[in-house]
């Protein structure tokens, strides 16, 4: 089993935040989805919570967003990729 160091997990979070930022600045994305993305960014930036808990909370919101019928296809793909990246963060950190 491959172990990720906390630096790897921090890098995953940093990359996810960059993608989330690009989604919030995309005017083709509906406002309710951009609000949810901002909420995810706040969760991921909240360092008072454990990293795995921030990732799990974010994945839950991403799953809700991905089911929105108004979500543009290119954004849906980004959201699936974000979810996959966040799932690589181990629970035991």
Swiss-Prot record:
Source domain of life: Archaea
Q: Which Gene3D superfamilies match?
A: Ta0600-like
User: Which cysteines in this chain are paired by disulphide bridges?
Assistant: none
Please give the Pfam families that the UniProt record associates with this protein.
Answer: UPF0147 (PF03685)
Similarity comment text for this entry: Belongs to the UPF0147 family.
Matching entries from NCBIfam families are given as: PRK04330.1
UniProt name for this protein: UPF0147 protein MM_1385
What species is given as this protein's source? Methanosarcina mazei (strain ATCC BAA-159 / DSM 3647 / Goe1 / Go1 / JCM 11833 / OCM 88)
Top-down, what is the taxonomic lineage of the species of origin? Archaea, Methanobacteriati, Methanobacteriota, Stenosarchaea group, Methanomicrobia
